Curated annotation (Swiss-Prot):
<dbReference type="InterPro" id="IPR011004">
    <property type="entry name" value="Trimer_LpxA-like_sf"/>
</dbReference>
<comment type="pathway">
    <text>Bacterial outer membrane biogenesis; LPS lipid A biosynthesis.</text>
</comment>
<keyword id="KW-0444">Lipid biosynthesis</keyword>
<dbReference type="GO" id="GO:0016020">
    <property type="term" value="C:membrane"/>
</dbReference>
<comment type="subunit">
    <text>Homotrimer.</text>
</comment>
<dbReference type="Pfam" id="PF04613">
    <property type="entry name" value="LpxD"/>
</dbReference>
<keyword id="KW-0441">Lipid A biosynthesis</keyword>
<comment type="similarity">
    <text>Belongs to the transferase hexapeptide repeat family. LpxD subfamily.</text>
</comment>
<dbReference type="Pfam" id="PF00132">
    <property type="entry name" value="Hexapep"/>
</dbReference>
<dbReference type="Pfam" id="PF14602">
    <property type="entry name" value="Hexapep_2"/>
</dbReference>
<keyword id="KW-0012">Acyltransferase</keyword>
<dbReference type="InterPro" id="IPR001451">
    <property type="entry name" value="Hexapep"/>
</dbReference>
<keyword id="KW-0677">Repeat</keyword>
<comment type="function">
    <text>Catalyzes the N-acylation of UDP-3-O-acylglucosamine using 3-hydroxyacyl-ACP as the acyl donor. Is involved in the biosynthesis of lipid A, a phosphorylated glycolipid that anchors the lipopolysaccharide to the outer membrane of the cell.</text>
</comment>
<protein>
    <recommendedName>
        <fullName>UDP-3-O-acylglucosamine N-acyltransferase</fullName>
        <ecNumber>2.3.1.191</ecNumber>
    </recommendedName>
</protein>
<dbReference type="InterPro" id="IPR020573">
    <property type="entry name" value="UDP_GlcNAc_AcTrfase_non-rep"/>
</dbReference>
<dbReference type="GO" id="GO:0009245">
    <property type="term" value="P:lipid A biosynthetic process"/>
</dbReference>
């Protein structure tokens, strides 16, 4: 499928610079693009590559330097390029129905146009919405509820009674609803606290591969609408993640913590239990959050502090050995002077 630059600009709501009739048959990066492809520039760091790219056209921010190349100007080129990917590339066709080798227990309700691949297991009483895709190895325990237009990739497990909203994608190997880590000490050992709650994943959530979201002890661990979770994330029991949050890889969130809306946690952030993080908070990678965080802050470090303070601290750290030598020399000099004063010299 080929489209003219004018057609693409109209689809995106952008403005053409150069030859609007040039035909585009694919998308590529600045480095790998060739004739007939469209590339994009979203990060000014790579602006110099526009001059050398072999793409037939460049999608870029309004008023950018085209270096004489055909271009589409758009106020948000990154978002525009994402929309183009859905225009130029479609997912492989999927079979419809329950394929041989899948197991569907008694009492399951299947919606219209579902795709259940070989090796998938659906437990008794589960409710599956329309246009749901269950890839090989997916396990839905009894009583699970899955909304419409959901894709569960290979080897995803959703434990008993947990609920998945509409337009949710969960990637390979993730577990939804495993037991929370709850034990009561009895003086000699630990007594397991039964975890009888559930996990609720709301609409338009995407969860990466090999994540674990534990079920609540009594009520619900909840992932609210629009949140995106990267690979290898651990979310403990009773946690509530707000709307449109970004949780990057290897984050760990301890039990009963609550995140507000539009919170971003960078890679490997550790969050203590039973705390609250307000709306619109950004926390830098490898940070440790031990207490409540007020809204509208950018924090980093262990423990977290305002990001600018952390940058100053990080800048000082490499100088500490030399500063210690200087301080030791000054201490020695002060001691010598005090000794002389004591002798009346």
């Amino acid at each position: 499928m080929k489209k003219s630059l004018n057609e693409i600009a109209q689809y995106l709501g952008g403005t053409v610079s150069g030859d609007g009739e040039v035909l585009i048959g694919g998308l590529a990066t600045l480095d790998d693009a060739g004739e007939g492809t469209l590339t994009f520039l979203a990060n000014p760091k790579y602006a110099a590559k526009v001059a050398t790219t072999k793409a037939s056209a460049v999608l870029m921010g309004t008023g950018g330097n085209t270096h004489g190349k055909n271009a589409i100007f758009h106020p948000n080129p990154y978002l525009a390029f994402a929309k183009l990917l859905t225009l130029f590339y479609t997912a492989p066709a999927k079979p419809v129905g329950v394929l041989p080798g899948a197991f569907v227990a008694d009492g399951v309700k299947l919606g219209a146009d579902v795709s259940v691949y070989p090796g998938a297991y659906i437990g008794a009483g589960a409710v599956i919405g329309d246009r749901v895709v269950l890839h090989p190895g997916v396990v839905l325990y009894p009583g699970v509820v899955v909304g419409n237009d959901v894709t569960l990739h290979a080897n995803v497990s959703v434990r008993e009674r947990c609920r998945i909203g509409n337009r949710v994608t969960i990637h390979d190997g993730t577990v939804i609803g495993s037991d929370g880590f709850g034990y009561a000490p009895d003086g000699a050992s630990y007594y397991k606290i039964p975890q009888i709650g559930i996990v609720i994943v709301e609409d338009d959530v995407e969860i990466g591969s090999n994540c674990v979201i534990d079920r609540a002890a009594l009520e619900a661990t909840r992932i609210r609408r629009g949140t995106k979770i990267d690979n290898l994330v651990q979310i403990a029991h009773n946690v509530v993640i707000g709307e449109d949050c970004i949780i990057v890889s290897q984050v760990g969130i301890s039990g009963s913590t609550q995140l507000g809306n539009h919170v971003t946690l960078g890679g490997q952030v550790g969050v203590a239990g039973h705390i609250k993080i307000g709306d619109n908070v950004m926390i830098g990678a490898k940070s440790g959050v031990a207490g409540n965080v007020e809204p509208n802050q950018v924090l980093s470090g262990i423990p977290v502090m305002p990001h600018r303070d952390w940058l100053r601290s990080a800048g000082i750290a490499p100088k500490l050995p030399e500063m210690k030598k200087t301080l030791s020399a000054l201490e020695k000099r002060v001691a010598e002077l005090e000794a002389k004063l004591a002798k009346g010299e």
